Structure formats: C-alpha cells, structure tokens
Amino acid sequence: MTKFRGCIDIHSGQVKQIVGGTLTDSDADLKTNFVATQPPGYFAQLYKDNNVVGTHVIKLGPGCDEAAEEALAGWPDHLQIGGGINHDNAEKWIKLGASHVIVTSFLFPDAKLDMKRLTDLEAILEPYGGKKRIVVDLSCRRKDGKWVVAMNRWQTLTDTEVNKETLEQLAKHCDEFLIHAADVEGLCNGIDEELVTKLGEWLEEGHLPPVTYAGGAKNIDDLALVQKLSHGKVDLTYGSALDVFGGDKVKFSDCVEWNEKMHK
C-alpha cells in the first residue's frame, strides 16, 4: 500500500524546498520555494512524532553536514541520509544514526554506472547489515521518451536508463530505491504519472525492493493516484506543496492521516 514519506532537504545549512532543475554550482541560478526558520531537528521531531517512517534527509551541496547531523540526532536510526555519500563517509553516517545511506553520483564515475562501487559499499557496511543499509537514488530526467538517471545535482545525464533491468541489477545490493523525477521536482504541477505507472509494473513483475517517488506532488489526492497507478507498490514524498514547507496545497496532517488509515 502506498505510504506518505517525508523529506528534509538541506541547502547551505538550512532546510529548503527548491526547484530541482535549478540546482547548479551557481547560487544565482537557484530557484527556492521555501527557506525554513526552524532548524533541521524541528522537522526530524515532527516526522518522529507522527511516525513518518522512511523519511530522507538530503544534503544539497557543501555546508550541510552539521545540519544533517542535527536532523539524524532528532530521530536516531530512522532517517535516511543522502548527498555526497561515498565509501569514505558512509560508515560515519550510519554511526551518526542514519538508518540508510542514499547513493547516486558516487555510483556513476564519468556518468557511467560502476557496479563495483556499489558492491564495495555493501562490503564496507556489512557489519551494520550491508545492503539493508543502502538506498540507491535513481533520480532521472526524461530524454527521447525514456527516463535517464541524472547525477551531479541532476545536471548530468548518465549512461543508465531507469527501467526494469536496471532495477533488477541494482536490487541485489540495496534495500530501497528513491526516484526523484527531476524535471517536475519543486514545480507542484503534478507527478510524472507515466513513470509512476511504469515503476508499479516493474515492481509487480520482479521481486524488487520498495520505491519512493518524489517530484511534482501537488495535492492530497496524489497519494490515492500513486496508489492506483502503481497498485500500491510505490510510496510518495511531498515537498514544496506541504504546509510545513510553506505550501498551501497539502496539509501535513492529511498525509499523516492517510498513513494511519491505510496502514492500520
């Protein structure tokens, strides 16, 4: 059954909601929907109090480690951490209280998928559960009617398509997938229905781990839409539309109520 999953996006040490396609090395290009006055720990506590499991904390660029550590400390062993994760720092983040590390760019040196990097990471984390601690982020952009994994803050397209074969290949070495539809991220103009439908089909056909979709969710009905399109196989994250992130389209309390109602 489709669940609401939370997010805490951190940029320059603050919790923010941004337009995904505008995240580059230059802050001049950045389009921001929301900058929180509350610290990251406030949002961690909010998710904890409402039992929004599987929430992810994403570090968007440098200067975010301290804020991310504060978030993890707010709900130890329950929040996933992503952004700049590699084999040198993954163990540190697990020790700091992350339930999972989320990896993207590290797996794609020179924009090409390197499976050895994933298996090496799995081996490093073996004392903590190995693959059960890894989420692979296959954030993607549309190209020629397909979805191509995008890295480097979603600016660089890789050689890897998001499809059933890719999911099956990676599933042997991870516990979950996180998929941001970067083209619609932060726009609140609706989810990529075609991608969600396909994800549901691929998950139904193969023995694949859970998938969380993020990007474009604009009203509470999107939870029911994702449930229908994916046959309950895909979970949904809300960002800029949520009232706790300054949005006026979706109430956080309604999302929590959905989880309680659907998962009694």
UniProtKB/Swiss-Prot annotation:
**Is Methyltransferase tagged as a keyword?**
no
What are the transmembrane regions?
Answer: none
SUPFAM superfamilies from the UniProt entry: Ribulose-phoshate binding barrel
Catalysed transformations (reactions): 1-(5-phospho-beta-D-ribosyl)-5-[(5-phospho-beta-D-ribosylamino)methylideneamino]imidazole-4-carboxamide = 5-[(5-phospho-1-deoxy-D-ribulos-1-ylimino)methylamino]-1-(5-phospho-beta-D-ribosyl)imidazole-4-carboxamide
Subcellular location as annotated: Cytoplasm
Cellular component per GO? cytoplasm
**What are the record keywords, sorted?**
Amino-acid biosynthesis, Cytoplasm, Histidine biosynthesis, Isomerase
According to its UniProt record, the EC number is 5.3.1.16
* Protein family (similarity comment): Belongs to the HisA/HisF family.
Sorted alphabetically, which NCBIfam families does this protein's record hold? Answer: hisA_euk
**Name listed for the protein in its UniProt record:** 1-(5-phosphoribosyl)-5-[(5-phosphoribosylamino)methylideneamino] imidazole-4-carboxamide isomerase
Q: What is the lineage of its organism?
A: Eukaryota, Fungi, Dikarya, Ascomycota, Saccharomycotina
